[in-house]
Structures are given as structure tokens and as C-alpha cells.
Amino acid sequence: MSLKSFIARKWAAYIRKKIDQWASDPIVTQEKVFLSIIQKAKHTAFGHDHHFEEIHSYEDFVQRVPIRDYEALAPYIERVKKGEENILWPGKPLYFAKTSGTTSGAKYIPLTKESMPYHIEAARNAIMCYIAETGKADFVSGKMIFLQGSPILEKKNGIRLGRLSGISAHYVPKYLQTNRMPSWKTNCIEDWETKIDAIVEETIHENMTLISGIPPWVQMYFERLQQKSQKTVGELFPNFQLFIYGGVNYEPYRQKFEHLIGRKVDSVELYPASEGFFAYQDTQTQKGMLLLLNAGIFYEFIEADTFFSENPKRISLKDVQLGVNYVLIVSTNAGLWGYNMGDTVMFTSLKPYRIVVTGRIKHFISAFGEHVIAKEVEEALAETLAQQGGEVSEFTVAPQVNPPAGELPYHEWFIEFEQAPKDMEAFAHTLDQALQAQNSYYKDLIEGKVLQRLRITPVPKGSFAQYMKSQGKLGGQNKTQHLANDRSIADKLSEK
């Protein structure tokens, strides 16, 4: 065992103990965070507008601070962008994390001197939890790669802005600097395909032990490595031990990854976002990610089924239940208040509080009242691949509301197969049965002859990468939408 590995084990045990302390007293931990951020922001413009000086309890907060999405918060954000101070949080933010995804264009999410350290600490602690539980620490002596956006930052009215992953690249701890790849020069390449090729050249002969990134883009990296070397990733990197990922559900990609690697590797899931680092997988033995309760973020939840009603009920952590699909609402030490993340989560454990991300509140299919969510299609596909074989590179699902005359409507699955199943008919049947098992409304519609069984439309290799490229979303933090209630993606994929 190297000295670095020995120190990592000792440090991991210490970090795990600290985590267990706040996780064992979750409600008090959240109460402290809540009172702290309210007190800190009392004299901001937002605090004055919403009478923070009168807020002494969660009930007070609910009465004074409505739920907002980015568009509703934008007037305050615009003032911050113009250089005004003390708007959402004392002073000015250190950075704006620039993300895509609103009707009005890019989002500018503030990162403050109080919030930024938690982003870095959470990523580190996820690794520490893995070491503390498994005792595996040899990977810290090898090379590590973090597939991320360009670290080149712009500046606007004294505030730097860029992609969150690019901003985070400026905070890599000193003890990782010599292990970290790719080089700064390569990391600054904007074009994703050019960047991947450069990363392959830099890493192909290195001792890679930890690889991190969003699964579809790591998959592209692995495929390029295999094309160049004619070897599996596991043969190229015999000491590759840990895959760290976030952004999308890994299960639909797992078989493909294991084929590319040539063996199984341990994995750790993260739940980072520009708005905050919310959770990470703290154990290899239980489902879900530990919700980070002491990270300057106060959490609220709204049942997804009631979210679009006139006055949906907001609850704090103490009232959540297992197995209920909730919309995640956050208030943070970066100046977001009652902020609708748009993500849906479900608790898998209440001691400690662990969650899985189930999808996006706007990403669903309910053209016929079925309200199928991302988690359901992803789990149905993973189950089908396990039963029927095949490998999937990427997929999306859309409703076909207007089929040819005389036919019932159906869900159309556009799947890019790396390796097609031997029997596509059996695959489609198993997939439909798996989705019915996931969603009782869908099952009722099938049995009631409102819908016919789903159909699979295989698309050529590279179709999804081409689609993402056409949208200016190839690489980085961008993710393929796995289902939609319209056919905007489906129609693009159907174009000849």
C-alpha cells in the first residue's frame, strides 16, 4: 500500500464519522441551516421584499416566500448580473454558473463564497465514503480523469461566469493536481469531439484508476479508446477501479459500459447541479444517495402528483414518506429561495435520508393520462436488457397520438442499439410488460384498449450524437432527454 493510499484510508474514516454525526440528527441539522441562511440574507433586497425579519419558523417562510422557477427569479438575477450588491445574498456572487434550459435562454445561477466550498467538499466526501466502506484506496495513487466543460471563464460586471464543471476545475485540491487529467490545455478545447480525441491521446498510455463524467459522454470516450487501441478499456487500464457519474441514470448504460470495459467496476453516483450539490451515494450496499443536509441548502418537497394544482402543499424533510415522487424545492446560501429545481426525487430510506432522482417534472409522457416518468422507462429498459440481451447506446420515448387510420395510439421508443437483441419482437413485448409493471395507469390503458403495445424504432449508430450536435448540446453537462410528451425529438430522429 502506498503512503497516499494509507493516508486516504485514515482520512476517509475521519470524514465518514463527521458525516454520520449530522446524518444522525437530520431535522435539527436542517433547522440550523434554515435559520442560518434566513438570518444571513435578512438585509438583502429579496429579504426585505419578503420580510425575512419576520420569519422565525418554516410556516412563516411558506407564508412569505412563494415557489419560484428561474423565470420568476430572473428579475433579481438580472440586478445581480448588472453588478448590484446585496440582492439575493450579501455582497456579490463569486461566479455565475451558466446553464441551458429555459424558455428565455441561458440560466445564470449564482455561486457564492459560502456555497462554492460545499460543491468541492461533497465530491471529495463521496470518494471518502467509498474508501471508508470498501477499504479500497489504491486508486488514489493512479491517474484520475474528470470529463468536464472548459475552465475558461468570462467576466461580467466583475463576476466570472462559465459552466459549473469548468468553474470546479479551478478548485481541484493540490493533492490531486499531479494525478488529474486531462491537461489544462486539452480541458480548454470547446469542441467536444475534438476534445475527446485529445483526451484519448493524452490518457491512452496512462495508469487511469478513476474516471468521472456523465455516462453518455464517458461512453463516447471509451468507444474512441477502443477504436484507437483495439482493446477493451479494462485491458488498457488494468487498474481502473472506480467510475463516478451523475446527471443521468446509469442503469440503461451499465451493460454497454461493462462490455466496453470488459469487466465490472465499482461506481459512485453523484447529484450535483449548478444550484447546489444535493446528494451522493455513500454506500455500495443500499439503494439511493445520501441527501446533504448540512451543505447550506434547505430542502422542501411537493408531491409530484399535486404539483400543477392551484395550491400544492409544501413540506419539509420531517414530513416526507418513502416511495412518494416529490418535486425538489431548495433555498440556498447562494441566494435561491423557494426555488423549483424541476427535478423529481423519491426517498429510499429515512434513516438516513437517501434519495433517487426519478426524472424531471416536465419530462414525462401523459398524452393519454398515464404520466410515465423517466425512472419508469429507464428501469423497464434495464430490466428488459437483462432478460433479452442487447446493448443500448441511447434512447428516447415519445407518444404517437395520430397513428394511421384504424390503429390505436402507442408509445414509440427510438433506440440506438450498439448490439441489437436477437429477437426484437420478444424484446418489445418484455419491455412493454416491464413498463406496465412500473406504471399501473399505463397497464390500465393497454388492457382497456386505449393504447396498443409500444413500438420500437431502431435508429442508426450516431443518431443521438448527431441530434445533440444539431442542438448545440454535444458533450459537457448536456443530457439526452429520455422521454417527452411531444414529438419534437422523435420527429428530428425520424428525418431521413
Identify the function of each model-found stretch.
Residues Y130-K174:
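Conserved AMP-binding loop of ANL adenylate-forming enzymes
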Residues K81-A97:
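Conserved pre-ATP/AMP-binding loop-to-beta segment of ANL
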